Design a protein with these regions (language model features):
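Extracytoplasmic loops and strand-loop junctions of Gram-negative outer membrane beta-barrel proteins
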Residues: 80-82, 269-274
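Alpha-helical transmembrane segments and their membrane-interface exit regions
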Residues: 39-45, 90-97, 216-221, 240
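A membrane-periplasm/extracellular boundary helix in multi-pass inner-membrane enzymes
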Residues: 126, 221-271, 286-294, 302
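Alpha-helical transmembrane segments of multi-pass inner-membrane proteins
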Residues: 17-19, 66, 70, 94, ...
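Hydrophobic core segments of alpha-helical transmembrane domains in multi-pass membrane proteins
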Residues: 33-41, 88-91, 209-214, 232-233
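Extracytoplasmic catalytic/substrate-binding loops of multi-pass membrane glycan-assembly enzymes
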Residues: 31, 90-92, 272-285, 296-302
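Non-cytosolic membrane-interface motifs at loop->transmembrane helix junctions
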Residues: 81-88, 146-150
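Transmembrane signal-anchor hairpin modules in multi-pass inner-membrane enzymes, especially those
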Residues: 1-84, 101-111, 115, 173-185, ...
């Protein structure tokens, strides 16, 4: 590999490391980084005449799915408004190939991610806890709701969703490099702090999905039963402490969920007529059903 190619490769590796941060900064930065990575991947593929990425079942299946999306979108009433988004769907598969390509080219990239991830998570979770305890984050962004925290996302209450999507990746990389005991313990502590912070954000969907994921991992991972029970006990104990000092967490995660799912009346202490969906979501369900009935085979498009 030439010196120029090495510099380009290092630049692309650096851009990959910046991806988690770019989600916090804004969608424009994400699009710029992904576009650069995709173009570089295509450039190197053409230069080296390596078309193996396009000659496999994954790419063929994606092409079939992509054609299906284009076809179904023609029947959409909003094609003129959304056609650009639909046409550029192909960038998802190219982005996946680009990541795989640069992981192969830079043998140390995964290790760089392993070292860089704790720094990102530490800043984000420290900022989240700071906002929880002091009602504003490190940049001075206030809480937009008393029972929710958003950190660097300002008025977008997506901190829990953001972290819950990164935790599986972070945990996977940590287990991959589990031989380094010090970093493994450090990363597990950061992951534990992240799980608690997701609970504190008040995002129930993100929290419950993460709990299901963690329970599955704890069940299938090759640890002693004592260690598994200890992990569950520690997490439950930490949750209990925060609930004790802030009962609104229990109200949001448990009481509101039971009320919405089972139409429970806490004042009368009884269940009313159980509904399978909240009242405010009924128009969405009925509209979706009508759209499906109009085009049962190929749908209405994305």
């Amino acid at each position: 590999m030439t010196e120029i190619n090495k510099k380009i490769l290092n630049l692309n590796s650096f851009l990959i490391l910046l991806l988690p941060i770019s989600f916090v900064v804004g969608s424009l930065i994400i699009e710029i980084i992904t576009t650069i990575l995709i173009l570089q991947f295509i450039f190197f593929s053409l230069k080296e005449k390596n078309f193996s990425y396009f000659n496999n079942k994954i790419f063929i299946y994606f092409c079939i799915f992509y054609i299906f999306l284009l076809t179904s979108s023609l029947y959409s009433n909003y094609f003129s408004e959304n056609y650009l988004n639909i046409i550029f769907y192909f960038r998802f598969i190219f982005f996946s190939f680009a990541l795989y390509f640069f992981l192969i080219q830079d043998k140390n990239l995964l290790k760089k991610i392993y070292i860089f991830f704790p720094l990102i998570f530490f800043v984000i979770i420290f900022d989240g806890y700071w906002q929880y305890f002091f009602d504003e984050n490190l940049l001075g962004y206030p809480k937009y709701r008393s029972d929710r925290i958003s950190g660097f996302f300002k008025d977008d209450l997506i901190l829990g969703s953001y972290l819950s999507r990164l935790v599986p990746l972070y945990l996977g990389i940590t287990l991959f490099f589990i031989k380094n005991k010090f970093l493994t313990i450090l990363n597990l502590l950061i992951i534990l702090s992240t799980i608690v912070l997701i609970f504190l954000t008040g995002e129930r969907a993100a929290f419950f999905k993460l709990i299901i994921f963690l329970l599955i991992i704890i069940l299938i991972i090759d640890f002693k039963i004592v260690i598994k029970l200890s992990l569950i006990s520690i997490i439950a104990f930490i949750f209990s402490i925060f609930i004790f000092f802030n009962p609104s967490l229990l109200e949001r995660h448990y009481s509101q969920t039971i009320k919405q799912l089972f139409n429970y009346d806490y004042k009368k202490n009884e269940f009313n007529e159980i509904k399978i969906y909240p009242k405010n979501y009924l128009p969405m369900f009925t509209t979706s059903l009508k759209m499906f009935r109009n085009n049962k085979i190929i749908g209405q498009g994305p």
